């Protein structure tokens, strides 16, 4: 049953494809990727974008995988612009030439988020699994030359976190208007590589100090956002600002999710935009209503004074670690399952770091 208190979604993450030129070990896409032949057609995506705008979506985030792998990306961007949506492109930058950047700006892209693996070219390419560092720098310059605002997204992990300050410096040099430093979120392939990616407490402390210095050094410059490592905190992150409250995700095959990692919760039914209207999925589906509000909560969340701020933490993380999506997020110090997180932290030492398993390509 639909909750009459639920408002319209503000944003939609549009995962056009799982195909990607990179092989990052912290990839948050599902372990089982959507094959090219199972991807939605341009016509199907056009209909979904139209439905989303009618539903109330005002921000459309084109992502993947790598959205530039879709030759119909410019047409879909143009359709989103004609619908009146704010268009954001989330990209690795591989293949984003000056010509393509100008064309996408002309078609309707309002903003670009570009991933950067490291300030050190060799280290960054080792994580990306491809020789792409120079291409990324050229893509960043193409974005700013096209007159588009640029956000540089940097995922922090054990292998690059000691260069936090250098990565901020590089992003500033590239003309970034916004820099997001996000500690690795352990979903999908990232959870598989957790032991190799988890930084030490000392590394995190040094990174926070580097961010503090950068904010002082670049005061009045680009916005600098730091996303904390929730495993080391005693309170969970307010994931998605609440389940099914402001955002939805559509996968390459048309599955509609309350958050990008909700594929991990195998106990929930999977809704698909080819089988049910987007408005019905948002307002009336069991998957979207399962963890809205606070009625689903158990103790200690049910009576916690922070329940309206942190929403009980991340449902996907709770399921992946406990097998119960309604459990208190184990990252919370009050969770009866906090020992699961503490055990993972206990494995992080100053000794040898296990090798990570690179993300494989979409099967042919």
From Swiss-Prot:
<dbReference type="InterPro" id="IPR011843">
    <property type="entry name" value="PQQ_synth_PqqE_bac"/>
</dbReference>
<feature type="binding site">
    <location>
        <position position="27"/>
    </location>
    <ligand>
        <name>[4Fe-4S] cluster</name>
    </ligand>
</feature>
<keyword id="KW-0479">Metal-binding</keyword>
<protein>
    <recommendedName>
        <fullName>PqqA peptide cyclase</fullName>
        <ecNumber>1.21.98.4</ecNumber>
    </recommendedName>
</protein>
<dbReference type="InterPro" id="IPR023885">
    <property type="entry name" value="4Fe4S-binding_SPASM_dom"/>
</dbReference>
<feature type="domain" description="Radical SAM core">
    <location>
        <begin position="6"/>
        <end position="222"/>
    </location>
</feature>
<feature type="binding site">
    <location>
        <position position="24"/>
    </location>
    <ligand>
        <name>[4Fe-4S] cluster</name>
    </ligand>
</feature>
<keyword id="KW-0884">PQQ biosynthesis</keyword>
<dbReference type="GO" id="GO:0016491">
    <property type="term" value="F:oxidoreductase activity"/>
</dbReference>
<dbReference type="InterPro" id="IPR050377">
    <property type="entry name" value="Radical_SAM_PqqE_MftC-like"/>
</dbReference>
<keyword id="KW-0411">Iron-sulfur</keyword>
<dbReference type="InterPro" id="IPR013785">
    <property type="entry name" value="Aldolase_TIM"/>
</dbReference>
<keyword id="KW-0408">Iron</keyword>
<feature type="binding site">
    <location>
        <position position="20"/>
    </location>
    <ligand>
        <name>[4Fe-4S] cluster</name>
    </ligand>
</feature>
<keyword id="KW-0949">S-adenosyl-L-methionine</keyword>
<keyword id="KW-0004">4Fe-4S</keyword>
<comment type="pathway">
    <text>Cofactor biosynthesis; pyrroloquinoline quinone biosynthesis.</text>
</comment>
<dbReference type="GO" id="GO:0005506">
    <property type="term" value="F:iron ion binding"/>
</dbReference>
<dbReference type="GO" id="GO:0018189">
    <property type="term" value="P:pyrroloquinoline quinone biosynthetic process"/>
</dbReference>
<dbReference type="InterPro" id="IPR006638">
    <property type="entry name" value="Elp3/MiaA/NifB-like_rSAM"/>
</dbReference>
<keyword id="KW-0560">Oxidoreductase</keyword>
<comment type="subunit">
    <text>Interacts with PqqD. The interaction is necessary for activity of PqqE.</text>
</comment>
<dbReference type="InterPro" id="IPR007197">
    <property type="entry name" value="rSAM"/>
</dbReference>
<comment type="similarity">
    <text>Belongs to the radical SAM superfamily. PqqE family.</text>
</comment>
<comment type="function">
    <text>Catalyzes the cross-linking of a glutamate residue and a tyrosine residue in the PqqA protein as part of the biosynthesis of pyrroloquinoline quinone (PQQ).</text>
</comment>
<keyword id="KW-0614">Plasmid</keyword>
<dbReference type="Pfam" id="PF13186">
    <property type="entry name" value="SPASM"/>
</dbReference>
<dbReference type="GO" id="GO:0009975">
    <property type="term" value="F:cyclase activity"/>
</dbReference>
<dbReference type="Pfam" id="PF04055">
    <property type="entry name" value="Radical_SAM"/>
</dbReference>
<dbReference type="GO" id="GO:0051539">
    <property type="term" value="F:4 iron, 4 sulfur cluster binding"/>
</dbReference>
<dbReference type="GO" id="GO:1904047">
    <property type="term" value="F:S-adenosyl-L-methionine binding"/>
</dbReference>
<dbReference type="InterPro" id="IPR017200">
    <property type="entry name" value="PqqE-like"/>
</dbReference>
């Amino acid at each position: 049953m639909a909750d009459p208190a639920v408002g319209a979604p503000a944003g939609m993450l549009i995962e056009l494809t799982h195909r990607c030129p990179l092989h990052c070990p912290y990839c948050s896409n599902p372990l089982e990727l959507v094959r090219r032949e199972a991807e939605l057609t341009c016509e199907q995506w056009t209909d979904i974008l139209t439905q989303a705008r009618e539903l109330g979506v005002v921000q459309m985030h084109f992502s993947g995988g790598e959205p530039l792998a879709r030759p119909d990306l410019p047409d879909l961007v143009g359709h989103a612009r004609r619908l009146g949506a704010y268009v954001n492109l989330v990209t690795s930058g591989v293949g984003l030439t000056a010509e393509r950047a100008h064309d996408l700006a002309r078609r309707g892209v309002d903003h670009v988020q570009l991933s950067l693996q490291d300030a050190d070219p060799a280290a960054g390419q080792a994580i990306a699994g491809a020789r792409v560092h120079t291409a990324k720098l050229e893509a960043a310059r193409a974005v700013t030359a096209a007159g588009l605002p640029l956000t540089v997204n940097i995922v922090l992990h054990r292998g690059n976190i000691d260069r936090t300050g250098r990565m901020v410096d590089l992003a500033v040099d590239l003309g970034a208007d916004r820099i997001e430093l996000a500690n690795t979120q352990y979903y999908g392939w990232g959870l598989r590589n957790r032991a190799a990616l988890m930084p030490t407490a000392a590394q995190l402390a040094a990174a926070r100090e580097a961010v503090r210095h950068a904010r002082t050094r670049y005061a009045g410059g680009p916005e600098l956002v730091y996303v904390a490592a929730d495993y080391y905190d005693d309170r969970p992150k307010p994931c998605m600002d609440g389940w099914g409250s402001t955002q939805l995700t559509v996968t390459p095959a048309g599955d509609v999710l309350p958050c990008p990692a909700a594929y991990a919760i195998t106990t929930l039914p999977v809704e698909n935009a080819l089988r049910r209207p987007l408005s019905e999925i948002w307002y009336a589906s069991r998957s979207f209503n399962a963890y809205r509000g606070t009625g689903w909560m158990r103790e200690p969340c049910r009576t916690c004074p922070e329940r309206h701020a942190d929403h009980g933490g991340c449902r996907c993380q709770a399921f992946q670690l406990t097998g119960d999506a309604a459990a208190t997020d184990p990252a919370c110090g009050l969770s009866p399952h906090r020992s699961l997180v503490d055990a993972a932290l206990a494995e992080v030492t100053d000794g040898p770091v296990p090798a990570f398993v690179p993300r494989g390509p979409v099967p042919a």
